[in-house]
């Protein structure tokens, strides 16, 4: 199964939130960039060979909409 995550460029750091849709990961990346004043966040693709991703699209988008 494929999922998307937000990561930090030139760093092993990433946010452990699995997104089913790349568009939702981009919304989260844009939020983090504005919040932190950083431009080095990007989207990575993760492929689960064993197990399933724990998709958090709805939960994260709901939290972001409440924080605006």
Enumerate the language-model features and the residues they cover:
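Short, mixed-charge low-complexity intrinsically disordered segments
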Residues: 14, 31-68
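Short amphipathic alpha-helices within nucleic acid-binding modules
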Residues: 25-28
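Short aromatic-glycine-(Arg/Gly/Cys) micro-motifs in beta-strand/loop hairpins
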Residues: 1-15, 41-44
């Amino acid at each position: 199964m494929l999922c998307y995550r937000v990561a930090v460029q030139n760093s092993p750091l990433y946010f452990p939130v699995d997104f089913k849709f790349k568009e939702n990961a981009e919304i989260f990346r844009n939020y983090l960039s504005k919040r932190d004043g950083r431009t080095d966040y990007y989207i990575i693709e993760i492929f689960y060979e064993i197990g399933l991703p724990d998709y958090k699209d709805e939960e994260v988008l709901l939290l972001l909409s409440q924080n605006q």
